[in-house]
């Protein structure tokens, strides 16, 4: 049975406010750059037979809250991993038919003292809910899970099962997205078709529609933009060459290649086939973050004196759970990222294009008015 992993980069949703540049990072901060780097590193640490769905946006917000309490080399490494970006609270463009929301929280053990300034920053700049509870009480786990469920419309429920005795604080971000397609698929056109997955062929429910889409072909791949109502958010689907091993998709997650492909998108008549899918997965992001240079935070040299005078503190587990449901009417997606802190010692082409997504592919859900990527995914089996 194939394994499925949901990363906080599952579908890509871009936020409104551009990131703040940080002097410690050699390049100009870009949320797209962070999102693609995060997605690429998640893929590198995933098993070959795993689907990957992540929310780079949710991970970025949670890590930004952690960075506010970091100092010294620990802060430098976190800033660099974030590509110099700070994902502070921002409006995400909810409309009459499109629902996009993000919520933040910080949970503090009642035996642990947090600096007032740190809590003030989280409350004022990240609109975070700060709650002090007894971490030894099992009801605290339920309270955190209830908060996650409430802010993902019940799509992400049991985020944690226990709080180890050395955990004194937990940060959480929840993001929820629900939007109808600008041009919906006709359910009567949906039929059983073969998806040529990495582990073999399998019948799936394939949605079909012929219409006008922004479309591009580059480096042997195809890209299509499928807009949602309001035309602010879109899903970008990338169909790599049929003979490409999905372990080698790094080229298509290169920022310059991705941005060049988006600029190449041009109106075309497309016969589109897109599989229906509902995926729920969870992921531990520790290995991913270490591969992005966040090393000091996990050891005895961690510097989180901006959080508390009690210590020393170090980074515990960074985890993410995701959900995505793609149907004829639209898309619903949700993600929760948790961070535990431990006390330790081109021109239009009028030809009809065909884009049958019946083999492994990449997708991104983006906010075209901003530099955020909320969800991204690599689907190799259905």
Model-flagged regions — what are they?
Residues 351:
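Long, His/Glu/Asp-enriched segments that create or flank divalent metal/ion-associated functional microenvironments
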Residues 11-12:
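Repetitive helical segments and hydrophobic/amphipathic motifs
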Residues 78-82, 185-194, 248-256:
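Short Gly/aromatic-enriched secondary-structure transition segments
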Residues 361-382:
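C-terminal or internal capping secondary-structure element at the end of a domain, subdomain, or sheet
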Residues 5-8, 19-135, 146, 368, ...:
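Detector for small/aliphatic-rich hydrophobic stretches
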Residues 49, 90-243, 263-348:
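Non-catalytic, conformational "gating/processing" segments within enzyme and secreted inhibitor domains
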Residues 354-359:
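Short loop/turn motifs at secondary-structure junctions and domain boundaries
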